[in-house]
């Protein structure tokens, strides 16, 4: 863990990694939603965050680059060899000013709340001991808890991440014992137990120098076991501040996600037209 002095004049860059290829939803970054490509909605949300000075899309695809720059937004063509979004944004961050704050905004979250971005950025800016910050959301059902695609985060009383896992954590021992050792049954009969769980979301805020260091570290045992990149940071002693998201976001991974996001953004578009 490194100690970082506070500097209220730090520049804050939102970098949005955007690939064209997607196993479940090919070309999703350019799929039309309410009259514009998905990626542009994400860019606009990031630009609305009060803490963000600049928004940059990092992509290895000319189609995404052209769609973004045609609307006057910044984009950078990166290497096609990157294994993760963190590696992609690190390539861009390497040319940004020293001491900058780097926000990794997932490109496939077109309804992300600008207030969530601000909360995460401010959490890092006001905590000189933290290397990075991220966000979490409440878990509202047993189905959501048991879904391995929903990463759970355990947060200590000090507000730092203790562990991330695809498994339900922490374990409700006493409640489980009262229900024959079955935690699922315990939660079904005591849904208030869900308040003990948090879902990790994909927004990350890094100090530039830590991001560059992190992406040079070799993969760790737990990271490879759970296939969770953030465990590499924890295993190497990073302090990760976790804050509650201002609103639930939706990552577009399936046709069902796309349909839901289209309904939300088209409704917002109609509401704006009525006001205008």
Model-identified regions with their sequence ranges:
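N-terminal glycine-rich phosphate-binding loop and ensuing alpha1 helix
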Residues: 11-58
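Short, high-confidence coil segments that cap the C-terminus of an alpha-helix
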Residues: 52, 98-99, 127-130, 238
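Short phosphate-binding loop-to-helix
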Residues: 56, 62-122
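A conserved hydrophobic position in a structured secondary element of the catalytic/binding core
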Residues: 59-60, 112, 206, 253
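Residues that scaffold the ATP/ADP-binding catalytic core of kinase and kinase-like folds
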Residues: 67, 92, 164, 213-214, ...
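Conserved core of the sugar-phosphate nucleotidyltransferase
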Residues: 113-220
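Conserved alpha/beta core of the MobA/IspD/sugar-nucleotide pyrophosphorylase nucleotidyltransferase superfamily
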Residues: 181-276
């Amino acid at each position: 863990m490194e100690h970082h002095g506070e500097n209220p004049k730090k520049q804050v860059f939102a970098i949005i990694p955007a690939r064209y290829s997607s196993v479940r939803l090919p070309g999703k970054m350019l799929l039309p939603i309410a009259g514009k490509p998905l990626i542009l909605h994400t860019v606009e949300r990031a630009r609305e965050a009060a803490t963000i000075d600049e928004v940059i899309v990092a992509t290895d695809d000319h189609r995404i680059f052209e769609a973004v720059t045609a609307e006057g937004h910044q984009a950078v063509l990166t290497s096609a060899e990157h294994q993760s979004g963190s590696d992609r944004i690190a390539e861009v961050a390497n040319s940004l000013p020293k001491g900058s704050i780097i926000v990794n905004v997932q490109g496939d979250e077109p309804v992300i709340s600008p207030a969530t971005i601000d909360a995460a950025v401010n959490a890092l800016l006001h905590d000189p001991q933290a290397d990075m910050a991220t966000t979490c959301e409440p878990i509202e059902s047993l189905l959501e808890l048991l879904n391995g695609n929903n990463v759970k985060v355990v947060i200590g009383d000090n507000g730092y991440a203790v562990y991330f896992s695809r498994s339900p954590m922490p374990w409700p021992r006493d409640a489980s014992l009262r229900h024959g050792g079955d935690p699922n049954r315990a939660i079904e009969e005591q849904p208030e137990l869900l308040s003990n769980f948090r879902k990790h979301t994909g927004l990350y805020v890094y100090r530039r120098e830590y991001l560059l260091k992190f992406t040079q570290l070799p993969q760790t045992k737990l990271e490879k076991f759970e296939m969770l990149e953030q465990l590499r940071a924890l295993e190497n002693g990073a302090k990760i501040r976790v804050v509650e998201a201002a609103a639930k976001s939706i990552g577009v991974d399936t046709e069902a996600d796309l349909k839901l996001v289209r309904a939300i953004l088209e409704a917002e578009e109609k509401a704006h037209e009525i006001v205008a």
